[in-house]
Amino acid sequence: MNKLETNNNQYWLDRWQNDDVGFCQESPNEFLVKHFSKLNINDSSVCLIPMCGCSIDMLFFLSKGVKVIGIELSEKAVLSFFSQNTINYEVIHGNDYKLYKGDDIEIYVADIFNLPKIANNLPVFDIWYDRGAYIALPNDLRTNYAKMMLEVCSNNTQILLLVMEHDKKSQTPPYSVTQAELIKNFSAKIKFELIDSKQRDNIPDYRKAEGMTEQYYTTYLRKKQY
């Protein structure tokens, strides 16, 4: 598979349609759990989760009293989330999206790059949590994604960004993201702090075939600006 094949929405729709979703976790992400207390949470906190899939992390936020806004391309993923977790919902149709609305959670079925178009329909969010969106995109789209998120985030948006860093350039997602890249793409408005870096114990065989010998989980935080 070459880079161009991961550049389009059909790639991800096919992954969901074929249940090729090994990136889905059965428990909340360990780095979210570890660093959640670093976020400033209150009764009105709302978290935006781009490319949310059917992530169990959404339940973690809900369990902490945080309302959730998800953006997801695959309607199958959204339906799976609500059915697997027996959450009631209503469906609302918009011009650029289809909204699945439950108690304290809204998931918009839409292309992530349509986010600026639907931003006015979203509740105001004070947290942006990104576990798999940024690293799911090849380099050119990551640059565009960063520009878009700079548009929709405010000075008070708290950000917990989970990425991966490899010793070889990835040909498939998740892609390697360095601190230097984040500075380049976000420094105009957002300053990230590296708060965690953990080496992966077992590198997948397909990564070894690419020549990879080291892989790290890295976590970045941007706190609320007072």
From Swiss-Prot:
GO cellular component, one term: cytoplasm
InterPro entries given in the database record: SAM-dependent_MTases_sf, Thiopurine_S-MeTrfase, TPMT
Any one Gene Ontology BP term: methylation
Assigned EC number: 2.1.1.67
Reaction(s) catalysed by this chain's protein: S-adenosyl-L-methionine + a thiopurine = S-adenosyl-L-homocysteine + a thiopurine S-methylether
Ranges in a coiled coil: none
Enzyme class: transferase
Location(s), subcellular: Cytoplasm
One term of GO molecular function: thiopurine S-methyltransferase activity
Keyword Repressor: no
Highest taxon listed in the record's lineage: Bacteria
Binding positions (S-adenosyl-L-methionine): 16, 51, 72, 131
Keywords, comma-separated and alphabetical: Cytoplasm, Methyltransferase, S-adenosyl-L-methionine, Transferase
Entries under Pfam families matching the protein: TPMT (PF05724)
UniProt family annotation: Belongs to the class I-like SAM-binding methyltransferase superfamily. TPMT family.
Protein name: Thiopurine S-methyltransferase
Species this protein is from: Francisella tularensis subsp. tularensis (strain SCHU S4 / Schu 4)
